[in-house]
């Protein structure tokens, strides 16, 4: 292992220890203080069915804390229920271009526009993401890239294709009223076209957290690695191995029922990508994404964000994202 790799792994371990062991990603709209009822064990199938179809927001009193020490023995045969609001009163929700940390049950359709993509015109994307909890410990997140349209790195005509499908198993490491920690492993499949800079096979393990101790302030983030593999990914597309990190503080200004501006949160997400392989310069890229999210009513949410690179080289000038979400 190189010195650079050792430093990165040491940093990851330090972050996990500081945020996890030293502490005492909807759970969308549950309120009330957390309780600690006796766990009711179900069959694996029953727990999955109730997690996916049950009224998981009606009885927040059935929620209880999960500890890191029982990650292999507790919660796997219990239906997922929405966790209560954090200690400061903020709901557990997701936002655009930031790590989740918490479990959710929802679907979101997202449109993205990228200006000056690879210095060769614009890029337009459309995707559908689903968050599907199977029990209190395990969830599947899927990202279906319905369309990716750009001129590639050197093309003169726009080409539209299906993108790279991503499926992400997620495990809750621990959860209290104030903090949720999760381990996620995203599997990117090369279903897209290399012309669009897709067709990449990669594994991306991440550690993520969500926290709320004081009023409407929520801090989320995490660290991970982007690990591409295969001849097409590395040689044809030029995918690079990278260390990634994210932190996204935000503040909630309105109550849930103040529609169409309910649960109004403004946030700024900072994303860092540091290339760590030997296939080129080991550059570090940083971008800032200010964003907003609001509850329109009937568990429909509107999300928007603008990502702006702040380091060079810049892969694009700016990227606009808009999402329409339904919590179910």
Describe each PLM feature range.
Residues 23-27:
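Sec/Tat signal peptide C-region and signal peptidase I cleavage site
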Residues 2-10:
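Bacterial N-terminal signal peptides that target proteins for export
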Residues 1-2, 22, 266:
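Charged interaction patches that mediate protein-protein contacts
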Residues 11-20:
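Bacterial N-terminal signal peptides
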Residues 28-328:
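Transmembrane beta-barrel domains of Gram-negative outer membranes and organellar outer membranes
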């Amino acid at each position: 292992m190189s010195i650079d790799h050792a430093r990165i792994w040491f940093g990851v371990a330090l972050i996990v220890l500081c945020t996890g062991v030293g502490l005492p990603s909807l759970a969308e709209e549950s309120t009330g203080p957390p309780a600690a009822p006796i766990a009711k064990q179900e069959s694996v199938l029953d727990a999955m069915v109730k997690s996916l179809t049950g009224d998981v927001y009606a009885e927040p009193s059935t929620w209880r804390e999960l500890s890191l020490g029982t990650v292999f023995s507790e919660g796997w045969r219990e239906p997922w229920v929405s966790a209560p609001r954090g200690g400061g009163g903020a709901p557990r929700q997701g936002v655009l271009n930031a790590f989740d940390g918490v479990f959710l049950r929802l679907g979101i359709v997202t449109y993205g526009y990228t200006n000056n993509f690879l210095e060769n015109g614009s890029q337009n994307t459309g995707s559908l993401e689903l968050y599907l909890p199977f029990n209190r410990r395990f969830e599947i997140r899927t990202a279906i890239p319905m369309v990716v349209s750009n001129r590639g790195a050197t093309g003169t005509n726009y080409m539209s294709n299906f993108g790279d499908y991503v499926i992400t198993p997620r495990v809750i490491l621990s959860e209290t009223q104030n903090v949720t920690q999760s381990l996620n492993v995203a599997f990117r499949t090369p279903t897209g076209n290399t012309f669009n800079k897709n067709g990449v096979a990669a594994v991306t393990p991440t550690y993520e957290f969500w926290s709320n101790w004081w009023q409407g302030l929520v801090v989320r983030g995490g660290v991970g690695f982007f690990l591409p593999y295969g001849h097409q990914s590395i040689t044809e597309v030029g995918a690079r191995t990278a260390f990634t990190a994210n932190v996204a503080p935000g503040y909630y200004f309105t109550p849930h029922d103040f529609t169409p501006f309910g649960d109004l949160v403004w946030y700024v997400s900072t994303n860092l990508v540091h290339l760590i392989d030997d296939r080129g310069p080991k550059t570090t890229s940083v971008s800032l994404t200010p964003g907003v999210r609001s509850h329109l009513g009937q568990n429909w949410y509107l999300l928007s964000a603008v990502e702006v690179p702040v380091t060079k080289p810049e892969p694009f000038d700016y990227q606009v994202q808009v999402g329409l979400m339904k919590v179910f």
